[in-house]
Amino acid sequence: MTETFKHQSVLLKETVDALNVQPDGIYVDATLGGGGHSEYLLSQLTTGHLYSFDQDDHALESSRQRLAKYADAGQVTFIKSNFRFLKIALAEQGITKIDGILYDLGVSSPQFDDAQRGFSYKKEAPLDMRMDQGAELTAYTVVNEWSYQQLIKIFFRYGEEKFSKQVARKIEQQREIAPIETTIQLADLIKEAIPAPARRTGGHPAKRIFQAIRIAVNDELGAIEDSVEQAIPLVKVGGRISIITFQSLEDRLVKTMFKEQATLPDIPKGLPIMPGTEKTVLKLVNRKPILPTEDELTVNHRAHSAKLRVAEKQKEID
């Protein structure tokens, strides 16, 4: 099983080191994946503990093997859950405060590489795209049952695709004849819908549409928002949140959420500032995101769009 979930962690040291790991601290890896970030963090703990989340059975099984020595030592707890249920899942473990949390967002390499998962527009597979394979909603349902208007909405909102209407119309026309069953079928329809000059620039013409469908199937942005909103009060004062994003929608959301808690509210002119109120809930550790080094980009091409944002908790939310 371990061989089936090989994932090269992006910004590995930067993400974990940014947490200022305390050997006796309580930490969360919200996106276990291949276990790289968890393994590096665990190597710095003595009496501390790590709670590692994933909703993918293959990722959990693989990482259980990779991190067996830490599990045997009682230093790590694996939690099968979407990270949007962070607070309740930790409460079930008796945890109400943590020293830090990291997120490595998006789809992991093994999920893309396993053709049968349906994430790739280059490999023939059923239209699936579920990160949690126990979930009900699949890409097949979105493509074949969602209305023309619903498709336009997600293609614009989650794919930032300027030819959303043309693609939605093409899908609608095809499914009146027969259902769209596979990834390659869908990718070919998208190619047909997008004008030839536009197909020659900006990478594979199906990339943005597949991204939009994947985000819709897994409610990725909603899950990120829910989870980070829970993480901020969970983190102790002095603790940190490290988040790696891979596309502009994720990054914009994380940037906005951090900024909201790192900005003082407007105080009317002439009103005295009460002691202790001049601190924001969060402090941005880096004004600009941390990017992969040239060396990392050379060995891991999937790191090219990665951005790391880090925030430190300064005070509890009022």
From Swiss-Prot:
Any matching Pfam family: Methyltransf_5
EC number: 2.1.1.199
Top EC class, one word: transferase
Reaction(s) catalysed (UniProt annotation): cytidine(1402) in 16S rRNA + S-adenosyl-L-methionine = N(4)-methylcytidine(1402) in 16S rRNA + S-adenosyl-L-homocysteine + H(+)
InterPro entries named among the record's database cross-references: RsmH, SAM-dep_MeTrfase_MraW_recog, SAM-dependent_MTases_sf
Entry keyword set: Cytoplasm, Methyltransferase, rRNA processing, S-adenosyl-L-methionine, Transferase
Primary subcellular site in the record, as a coarse category: cytoplasm
Swiss-Prot/TrEMBL GO biological process terms: rRNA base methylation
Record-annotated disulphide pairs: none
GO cellular component, one term: cytoplasm
Gene Ontology terms for molecular function: rRNA (cytosine-N4-)-methyltransferase activity
Protein family according to the UniProt entry: Belongs to the methyltransferase superfamily. RsmH family.
Summary of the function given for this chain in its UniProt record: Specifically methylates the N4 position of cytidine in position 1402 (C1402) of 16S rRNA.
Protein name: Ribosomal RNA small subunit methyltransferase H
